[in-house]
């Protein structure tokens, strides 16, 4: 077996199959300004769906549909109903690595910025998204390793 790891972390500008947003709700740290933040997320969703697929992770898909359906290209939206602690997909989402066999979806531990905030629900999102087919690739469990806040560089 070789010690060489021949995989790449795709650049930010590389072609992608879509974008994930984890939607703000009353149980997130946005509660004090929820309406304002949801309007901002709706504007982000509108821009994304003009160009590519969007996966919205939310415990309230019907509520989010009401918020965005008038302004967003709903043909490019997929909803995954899932309990969440917060909105930071960069912290709890999969990290995709590409090799000769295709995509590997690395699922790292998010610990809520050093256990400052709950993150137990967020740590289930990637695994569920792969299980139900919203994310395609080989699931790689790395939940024993804390990696959050965009704390990697390629």
Over which residues does each language-model region extend?
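The feature marks the mature, well-folded catalytic cores of soluble enzymes
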Residues: 1-154
């Amino acid at each position: 077996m070789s010690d060489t790891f021949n995989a790449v972390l795709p650049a930010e500008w590389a072609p992608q199959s879509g974008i994930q947003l984890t939607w703000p709700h009353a149980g997130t740290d946005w509660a004090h300004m929820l309406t304002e933040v949801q309007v901002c997320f709706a504007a982000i969703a509108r821009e994304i769906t003009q160009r590519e697929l969007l996966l919205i992770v939310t415990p309230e898909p019907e509520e989010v549909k009401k918020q965005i359906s008038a302004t967003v290209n709903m043909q490019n939206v997929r909803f995954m109903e899932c309990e969440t602690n917060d909105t930071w997909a960069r912290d709890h989402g999969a990290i995709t690595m590409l090799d000769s066999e295709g995509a590997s979806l690395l699922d790292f531990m998010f610990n809520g910025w050093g256990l400052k905030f709950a993150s137990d629900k967020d740590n289930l999102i990637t695994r569920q998204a792969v299980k139900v087919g919203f994310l395609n690739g080989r699931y790689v469990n790395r939940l024993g390793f804390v990696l959050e806040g965009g704390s990697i560089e390629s």
